[in-house]
Amino acid sequence: MDDKLIHFGFSLGLNFMGYNVTDTNTPIDGEVYHARVSSLMPGCSVGFVTDLRLSRHLNLRFTPTLHFGEKTITYKTESGKPVEGILGNNEKVSVLALPIDIPLYLKWSAEREKNYRPYLIAGGGAHYDFGGDKEKPIYTKKWDFFVAFGLGCDLYMSWFKLCPEIRYQIGFNNVLTPVTDRPQLAVQNAFYTNALQRLTNQMITLTFNFE
């Protein structure tokens, strides 16, 4: 299989999605709010693999992947006290995420040892999120671009390769949609967005490629 110019496969896996959060640190009604990403909740991923052999150790891979998951942001007041009618302390807001990644990766493989072959992978691509609800407190922009890197190992079976792989993905863009671009947003929900200056995507994926 490693000697084929092109081969195909599919992937199944788990994802852990979140944000890198930057606060505004601007007082809102006399209180400063801080946001952080809560513990990452696992989601699932499914994708398709196209692999082009460039050399003995180098491959170019196209792996469009659809992810299902949820991101949760927790808000805390600087004083540690809730503000009546606005935000509570330790209040959580969930954002439904249904993104598709369209990446290109370079895969560098070591020499095969018996029935396994470790590798490193790096690349980037486009990210489009089908999730989100404009009526919710937090609404993110659809398009983003990212870089990713990781490692894995080809495990050779009789008829296919099983390739467990772990990757870390970092988005470039500020995906937060400001209140000024959301005229339909309820006033009581605007505080959640106004407390944030910047949101960038991040994701850890554990995938199993069948090739």
Please identify what each model-predicted range represents.
Residues K4-I6, L40-C44, L96-I100, Y116, ...:
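Residues that define the transmembrane beta-barrel architecture of outer-membrane proteins
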Residues S158-E211:
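Predominantly the C-terminal beta-signal and adjacent terminal strand-loop region
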Residues T22-V37, E70-V95, G131-T140, L176-L196:
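Flexible, solvent-exposed loop segments that connect beta-strands
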Residues I6-L12, L60-P64, I100-I102, P118-G124, ...:
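Transmembrane beta-strands of outer-membrane beta-barrel proteins
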Residues L14-G18, L66-E70, A110, G124-F130, ...:
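Transmembrane beta-strands of outer-membrane beta-barrel pores
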